[in-house]
């Protein structure tokens, strides 16, 4: 029997090891109260039905864990046959200090805030975040990979109303079950729940449940399980047709090559988006003649090394539920799928004929299917893009494994890729992440080595924000690995990376909330000869203040082996050779709740065979809740005295956000890049009649700040392109 007992103890230990804690350590699920009586969602939670709901016990999360909140808060959550309700009584001893920095829809901007997080499938990995400010501005996000990924471009149907009095501010929220999706067994659903209140000017946050700061309060794994009984979801069909018109013009050289003439086009487009929940857990989207006219222009960048720049996806159709399609191969390995490959060629829009998407859950599996087709235009062939992604929990509530397949096809050319991945919580805060992928082209030689067409990524990390955290990883990418539907910054390399922090909370200090020294060593080797191609080695001290600011100071050493000369910012050449150089970086940030704030990033030191001095300033002024003025200015001074060359590079960005109220808003983005001598202008005005019904006016223009002479002796036109677009979309619910 002793051997049996030892076997049982060993099995129990293994289960505890894999689950990251003692067996049976989960709290008993909390039965959520059912609303008895009528509630009007008007921001005045004074109905008797609310008083019958017990308030949730709240704990200070920041600035001092388990400290005494300075402002009184009550939060109640309940449900009825069709909705989840939440109400907050956010008392404030200084109502004039309540932060309302912006009325801009879908944007938290350092305001006071109330948020409710729901993990509808109770998988401890994914959640839906619904937040509102004292002005009633709503923002929502999808949380995935246990808080590692936040997607703020997701939109759904729900309500939030607020009021402000001399006592503070008050909120009511109503979330339809149809906007959640959940699994119900015999009419019973178990979800994860977290609620928070933020007093922005004090950087004070309270939460339910109590959450240790070594975790992020947005992690679904720290939510409290709740139980709803006698519930079921509905499955409405949403249809969103749109109509678009406008004027587009661009200069072209006349046939006699003596002058530029203006070509004009008047687009007239209609299209349709359909969304239907096939089940309470699985949603189907169909898009016909997909349009992205209202998308904000890309933030311009200056390439200061020899590897490809990464531009994030800004198109809402692809951002929505994009987390299911994430397959990231570490900081150097790129992505197996990057949706910017669809409908964009070198940043220029390509018409998208349409496509379909299926996302959600089928049993224990997270599922994502995407198929999109682009139109042939300007010498580019029509293309088809396909993606299939599956993922499911394994071993314990905090681990998952999955697979992905992608395809890109055009005119007989095909590229296929597939990959396998796993994220495993080994014990405590330690996780093992594994990724492996392989690509094939139609014309690929059968003699290509297995590893040459493959890429793998192995990462062991302690994901802690208290005490010691660390991350050790390696990535290897073969010379013939080429994901045509993804993003790959460099090819044929192997990395060995390590990074570590030690988080020290300073609860008794009047200024600092935590201080965390750290170090990193990133090394990238060429597979062809094993030589170190790039190396970064650094130590730093970083800090967060109780007021919400922070910063760090970081000396860093670089090693670079350049085989072929390249241009920095398209203006200065770096010759082939081996280089060792170093710099010092200082970053200072101010609390996001300040109406006038600025961040600074400054660095100076040697750079390849010369020197670099750089400063980045990002000021923001919330002049009123109706107007935000923000900007970025990056100045880089490069000098290579031994070669008697250098450059001053300027990148400036001015962004204006204006809102009359929660429905009417405008956005202006002006960007200047000295490496291209271009000024890009983007204006967008939106009127939101109702959720899903919008009118957009968009103006885009690119101006030449330096008009060069061409071969015919003509100066470049002042306006390189101009477009004015009017778009209306309306959502019908059936």
Predicted regions and their residues:
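N-terminal secretory signal peptides that target proteins for export/translocation
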Residues: 1-5
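Beta-propeller domains
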Residues: 376-391, 395-458, 464
């Amino acid at each position: 029997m002793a051997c049996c007992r030892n076997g049982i103890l060993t099995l129990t230990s293994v289960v505890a090891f894999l689950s990251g804690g003692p067996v049976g350590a989960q709290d008993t699920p909390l039965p959520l109260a059912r609303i008895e009586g009528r509630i009007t969602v008007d921001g005045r939670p004074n109905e008797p039905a609310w008083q019958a709901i017990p308030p949730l016990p709240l704990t200070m999360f920041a600035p001092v864990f388990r400290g005494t909140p300075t402002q009184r808060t009550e939060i109640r959550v309940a449900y009825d046959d069709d909705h989840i309700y939440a109400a907050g009584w956010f008392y404030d001893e200084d109502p004039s200090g309540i932060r309302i920095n912006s009325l801009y829809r879908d944007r938290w901007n350092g305001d006071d805030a109330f948020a409710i997080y729901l993990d509808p499938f109770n998988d401890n990995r994914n959640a839906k975040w619904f937040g509102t400010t004292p002005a009633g501005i709503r923002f929502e996000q999808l949380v995935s990979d246990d808080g590692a990924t936040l997607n703020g471009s997701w939109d759904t149907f729900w309500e939030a109303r607020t009021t402000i009095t001399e006592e503070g501010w008050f909120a009511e929220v109503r979330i339809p079950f149809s906007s959640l999706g959940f699994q119900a067994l015999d009419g019973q659903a178990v979800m994860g729940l977290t609620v928070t209140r933020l007093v922005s000017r004090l950087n004070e946050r309270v939460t339910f449940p109590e959450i240790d700061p070594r975790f992020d309060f947005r992690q679904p794994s720290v939510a409290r399980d709740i139980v709803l009984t006698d519930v079921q979801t509905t499955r409405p069909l949403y249809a969103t047709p749109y109509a678009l018109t406008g004027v587009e013009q661009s200069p072209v050289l006349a046939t006699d090559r003596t002058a530029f003439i203006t070509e004009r086009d008047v687009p007239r487009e209609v299209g349709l988006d359909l969304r239907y929940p096939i089940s309470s857990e699985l949603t189907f989207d169909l898009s016909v003649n997909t349009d992205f006219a209202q998308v904000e222009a890309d933030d311009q960048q200056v390439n200061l090394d020899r590897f490809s720049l990464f531009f994030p996806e800004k198109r809402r159709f692809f951002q929505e539920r994009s987390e299911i399609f994430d397959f990231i191969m570490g900081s150097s390995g790129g992505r197996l799928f990057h949706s910017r490959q669809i409908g964009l060629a070198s940043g220029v829009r390509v018409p998208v004929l349409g496509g379909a998407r299926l996302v959600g859950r089928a049993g224990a599996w997270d599922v994502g299917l995407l198929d999109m087709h682009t139109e042939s235009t300007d010498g580019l062939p029509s293309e088809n893009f396909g993606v299939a992604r599956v993922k499911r929990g394994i071993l314990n509530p905090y681990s998952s494994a999955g697979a992905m397949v992608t395809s890109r096809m055009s005119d007989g050319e095909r590229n296929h890729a597939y990959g396998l991945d796993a994220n495993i919580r080994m014990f405590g805060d330690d996780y093992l992440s594994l990724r492996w992928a392989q690509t094939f082209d139609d014309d690929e030689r059968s003699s290509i080595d297995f590893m040459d067409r493959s890429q793998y990524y192995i990462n062991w990390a302690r994901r802690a924000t208290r005490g010691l955290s660390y991350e050790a990883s390696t990535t290897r990418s073969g010379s013939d690995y080429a994901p045509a539907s993804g993003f790959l910054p460099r090819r044929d390399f192997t990395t060995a990376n390590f990074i570590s922090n030690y988080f020290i909370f300073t609860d008794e200090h009047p200024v600092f909330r935590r201080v965390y020294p750290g170090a990193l060593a990133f090394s990238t080797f060429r597979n062809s000869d094993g030589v170190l191609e790039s190396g970064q080695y650094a130590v730093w001290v970083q800090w967060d203040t109780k007021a919400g600011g922070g910063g760090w100071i970081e000396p860093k050493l670089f090693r670079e082996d350049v085989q072929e000369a390249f241009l920095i910012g398209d203006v200065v050449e770096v010759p082939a050779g081996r280089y060792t150089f170093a710099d010092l970086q200082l970053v200072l940030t101010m609390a996001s709740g300040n109406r006038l704030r600025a961040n600074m990033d400054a660095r100076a030191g040697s750079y390849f065979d010369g020197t670099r001095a750089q400063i980045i300033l990002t000021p923001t002024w919330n002049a009123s809740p109706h107007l935000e003025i923000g900007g970025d200015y990056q100045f880089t001074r490069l000098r290579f005295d031994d070669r008697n060359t250098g450059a001053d590079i300027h990148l400036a960005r001015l962004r204006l956000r204006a809102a009359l109220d929660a429905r009417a808003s405008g956005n202006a983005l002006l960007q200047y890049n000295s490496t291209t001598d271009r000024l890009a202008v983007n204006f967008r005005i939106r009127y939101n009649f109702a959720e899903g019904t919008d009118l957009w006016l968009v103006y885009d223009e690119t101006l030449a700040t330096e008009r060069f002479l061409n071969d015919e002796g003509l100066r470049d036109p002042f306006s390189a392109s101009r477009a004015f677009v009017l778009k209306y979309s309306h959502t019908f619910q059936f």
